[in-house]
Amino acid sequence: MVQRMWAEAAGPAGGAEPLFPGSRRSRSVWDAVRLEVGVPDSCPVVLHSFTQLDPDLPRPESSTQEIGEELINGVIYSISLRKVQLHHGGNKGQRWLGYENESALNLYETCKVRTVKAGTLEKLVEHLVPAFQGSDLSYVTIFLCTYRAFTTTQQVLDLLFKRYGRCDALTASSRYGCILPYSDEDGGPQDQLKNAISSILGTWLDQYSEDFCQPPDFPCLKQLVAYVQLNMPGSDLERRAHLLLAQLEHSEPIEAEPEALSPVPALKPTPELELALTPARAPSPVPAPAPEPEPAPTPAPGSELEVAPAPAPELQQAPEPAVGLESAPAPALELEPAPEQDPAPSQTLELEPAPAPVPSLQPSWPSPVVAENGLSEEKPHLLVFPPDLVAEQFTLMDAELFKKVVPYHCLGSIWSQRDKKGKEHLAPTIRATVTQFNSVANCVITTCLGNRSTKAPDRARVVEHWIEVARECRILKNFSSLYAILSALQSNSIHRLKKTWEDVSRDSFRIFQKLSEIFSDENNYSLSRELLIKEGTSKFATLEMNPKRAQKRPKETGIIQGTVPYLGTFLTDLVMLDTAMKDYLYGRLINFEKRRKEFEVIAQIKLLQSACNNYSIAPDEQFGAWFRAVERLSETESYNLSCELEPPSESASNTLRTKKNTAIVKRWSDRQAPSTELSTSGSSHSKSCDQLRCGPYLSSGDIADALSVHSAGSSSSDVEEINISFVPESPDGQEKKFWESASQSSPETSGISSASSSTSSSSASTTPVAATRTHKRSVSGLCNSSSALPLYNQQVGDCCIIRVSLDVDNGNMYKSILVTSQDKAPAVIRKAMDKHNLEEEEPEDYELLQILSDDRKLKIPENANVFYAMNSTANYDFVLKKRTFTKGVKVKHGASSTLPRMKQKGLKIAKGIF
């Protein structure tokens, strides 16, 4: 029997009746509360350890209960009962020790609360005033933050001033939801109305002044000024409105662009961030090299690398310095070689301006260097800069850009429009952060490749250096650059360098694994989201895999750190929210509940922006000049250079040319016994499937040369499932940026695979068939935890893994699917359609065929059990073919222009995220 023992006050009245006979209560000053399980005439078992709840924290059960909806004057309200505590009994110490006075009772009152769920535009605008002093206190904040998704500034002002045009003509109303609740204590209804409107307009001017930047006439702001002059003459609001109008009129020549561009001028002052902006800023790096000659002679830390001489010849070969690669994927990704790449993490975006800076940056490197002293050829190498300095400078750049992000530009309804004609000006502050992300990733790829004379051990030292930089970024809680570095190290052009990774130290690789786990796509990137929640506003990072010195350093110095998140997570969340929830309910009522959900994400962004003010980092001109001057490599250039450094083997080339998949079979056989043909001897790093997220260890140079892994498209800000596909030997297809738009993805692009239905990028480690052979360092322990999983081309127990591709002529994409002995053909076809983003199609319109040879295919009967109907002696390669007798619409290839169907991934949503 179990009895909860609370310490009672003196006297019999203070105790509780025993639940069971034979139980007894006990109290300890140290334990406060104990549980005893006992039986008569037996020794009780006492539970001494338990998790104590802070009595000051809210109770686990929800204090709010929704009971229904009400329709009042054209507005739908969500009705809920909220329990509010009226009296706090006893102090915290008394409650903790169990001595709380029984007379001190916790009294609660149940209140009926209305919150706007949906309504017409007129009613939503009208509700601003009563909500200001009503119970829906957050309504005004949410409305001002999200109204751009369903109306314009001019419409809101027109409706607001029409409804409350003359304060002196307003009659009071006591009914909630009409005009404005008031009390005699605060003056009459007219005074309260003036105060409410003044507060609403004042908040609007202070927090969203860019809404009124409409040069050259500024009609909205002038309309507001006229209203204030008439109804609130001499008020502080009138003064602020006149001041803002004067400022905008004086800055008109500079800001004569669409209102969404207003934040752009604020991005210009910081020279370190110039490369992250539009091409127009590319020339700015030219003056920057001025300080570069000074740094060149003082490479104190440069002793770390023996490749220092390499930079000189590198000037003409572009690979050696480092440039902004254009996008980076998640920990399990293999970003394709360079600026216009398509790999990206869970929440990725496409940046139109990104390619433009390429031509402008390339010429800027030689010219400024030559213009300086004879030191021009002594360009500093990456290893001249200590990892902590590099991480700090990246953090400074990222934090400045993130603080300038206009939060509502992240809304899915705005960000998803950026690629449309005439919308190129949208969200410039977000584009700047994307460009910076791509620049960091490109810098990593270029420096790791070095030039043609760089040896594998030297490249390994550079890789180790970047891993240390990533670790320092983690300490600084800079998740943006951390993600960019990890993604670049997992890019196709880097991860295929088998010899380079063989020389990477065990400790560095272990750190790399730990850091990569942060961005695991498992459960909608739950780990990175939890970290962001845990450390978002904390003073220091909570690290486990770092040395003790790294743990103590921030605390010893007393430096409080901010947090720079990976913005793609939030963009994904908001785009997914925009897709998942309807804009209108019951035909014409604006779904304001959707705006509440969006504001929850926006509020997180604002909170983290304020946390960025905690950083106190001084810019380093030498590093800034070096970083801005780094030359960009295109996707093809970085891939070709990688192939020159470590040429692909002939066997791999033949395999790719014939598009045979037998190599996959052997590659998976390596999981049980290393093969001399597919792997070399020797091993130092063994790891589990989860650890295989580290891109470079996923495959050897032989096969990975022609394989590419990518993820999320930005138009949907969704994360595509990572798949490995046979593609031409070199990425000659259209170059793509890291945060490529999913709507532009197609099988024609090397390594492009369609978005997964689960909307989370599936790492190669979690899709066994997608994994490629590892090199000699990792073959022995390739996947300890996967021994129970079925191997490709082999039926294990009652399940197997098959690969299903679409019946198209412009690519050979496939999706790996787990088939059990219970799966019928329609279920397998539906799985394949979901993987290929064909959710809108019907399974009845498709048929499943097994490819036995180049000229033979086995058709799986409509209702057959695929596990038993398939030919188990042939390759487990299938094709999803549209039936000829149906009037089907054009089959979607690659990623869909719309977001894939969401499954239960936390709102999955959100990309994120976080």
UniProtKB/Swiss-Prot annotation:
GO terms (BP aspect): Ras protein signal transduction
One Pfam assignment: RasGEF_N
Biased composition (Pro residues): 282-300
PROSITE patterns (alphabetical): RA (PS50200), RASGEF (PS00720), RASGEF_CAT (PS50009), RASGEF_NTER (PS50212)
UniProt KW tRNA processing keyword: no
Cited SMART domains: RA, RasGEF, RasGEFN
Residues that bear Phosphotyrosine: Y814
Residues annotated as domain Ras-GEF: 386-648
Gene Ontology cellular-component terms listed: brush border; cytosol; nucleus; plasma membrane
Ubl conjugation recorded as keyword: no
Entry-linked CDD domains: RA_RalGDS (cd17209), RasGEF (cd00155), REM (cd06224)
InterPro entries to which the protein is assigned, alphabetical: RA_dom, RalGDS_RA, Ras-like_GEF, Ras-like_Gua-exchang_fac_N, Ras_G-nucl-exch_fac_CS, Ras_GEF_dom_sf, RASGEF_cat_dom, RASGEF_cat_dom_sf
The record's account of how the chain is modified after translation: Phosphorylation of Tyr-814 by MET blocks HRAS binding.
Segments forming domain N-terminal Ras-GEF: 112-249
Ras-associating domain residues: 798-885
GO-annotated molecular function: GTPase regulator activity; guanyl-nucleotide exchange factor activity
Residue numbers spanned by region Disordered: 280-365, 666-689, 728-776
Described purpose of this protein according to its UniProt entry: Functions as a guanine nucleotide exchange factor (GEF) activating either RalA or RalB GTPases and plays an important role in intracellular transport. Interacts and acts as an effector molecule for R-Ras, H-Ras, K-Ras, and Rap. During bacterial clearance, recognizes 'Lys-33'-linked polyubiquitinated TRAF3 and subsequently mediates assembly of the exocyst complex.
Domain notes for this protein: The Ras-associating domain interacts with Ras.
Annotated PANTHER family: GUANINE NUCLEOTIDE EXCHANGE FACTOR, RAL GUANINE NUCLEOTIDE DISSOCIATION STIMULATOR
Protein name listed in UniProt: Ral guanine nucleotide dissociation stimulator
Lineage: Eukaryota, Metazoa, Chordata, Craniata, Vertebrata
Gene field: RALGDS
